């Protein structure tokens, strides 16, 4: 795993940040809230101490949504393009791993809330693979 800073950004590039591994955790979350928040079968989130995170641009363009009634669920997004962006959770920053501009060297350690996985989810090792669409 690298310990050099890794840049990341949202889809439109207005929100930019850097993280310095190692991560405290890196996991897939299959809970119904993460499915709704991502529009996918699971979230891929890395966590690291806030001291290992730095906003480079666009922090003022982020908006946080705290789910009413939830003790620990929130999402943040870029107000220009809607991409989920990092946010503070406890003492750590939650980093949607797909925002990182290069391989962090770490791999997800586990899948949590597996019993709630989407009924249509097929683990990747069980699917045909193609390098590009069509």
What are these regions (language model features)?
Residues 1-134:
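A short Gly-Trp-Pro
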